[in-house]
Amino acid sequence: MTSLSTLQAPSQSTNVSYGAVRAFYGHHKCATGWITRIFREMSFHLGRRHAIVHLPRHISPYASLADKVSAESIDVLIYTNAQIHEVQTLPEGSRGFHVVRDPRDVLVSAYFSHKHSHPSDKWPELEPHRDLLQTLSLEDGLAAEMVFSQSVFADMQAWDYKQPNVLELHMETLTADPDAGFQRIATFLGWLDPEALYSFAYRVQVRLNRLHYLGHARVPGPYPLLPVPRRPLATLPPDTLAHILEASRFNRLTGGRSRGEEDVQSHYRKGTPGDWRNHFTPALVDHFKAEWGDLLIQLGYETDHTWGLI
């Protein structure tokens, strides 16, 4: 009989190194909240120690992102406003996936989010910008948003898209088929082995790992509500991943609203690629081309500067 202290998936080691990390690299308004929800659940079930880094001030107590990872024994990193110079400090052997979105849709999504729904309690700089957006027309508001979100576009432009240890993805592809997308991600990270046969004991530990984090969430600190042991595991059973993805469908997160149905007050406003065409004007097209036209080509959303509203 397999004991919980010796359980493993076939052909997989349960040893987890806290040197090299597994990471999600994102950018503001590129489905970072949705991806974080799923990726964090994956790490919970695997019993991995994770950390979410949103802003430079979350790194600044340390000399670099690598120093933070080492000091806090981070195994899974969620870096939602990723900057390449910090990523390049991470230990050799780290692997991650990087998600970008059509910058024009980023702009529109940021405009509506910053005007209506994005929390500002931990982002006080948003408040004066939100007040400004309330006074502007849609066209002028989008122009103002282009200035406010400049760093988001700059980070995407500065990124190194040829890193062999980073899987590059378009948000539009990932949201269109989350099952295929996250299976690809999990395989790239070494977290998924479709050929493995998982023992009952292994599956029990997967559930215990999740309960461990649930206990700490309910009662933070050294004495959790549910004192359940956590054990880092190598791979995630495919049906567990499927369950995680099912719980994160757009209609479940929006109370039954279908993708494409707009609610400007919701964090999950619409979920439709190409929505920028419904909000840009010819003047905004010209403005965006002048500022970030090269970025669209760099990311593969356009092949030249001749694009327009049609």
Annotate each PLM feature:
Residues 1-169, 261-263, 269-273, 279-308:
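PAPS-dependent sulfotransferase catalytic domain
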Residues 49-64, 161, 165-278, 282, ...:
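The conserved 3'-phosphoadenosine-5'-phosphosulfate
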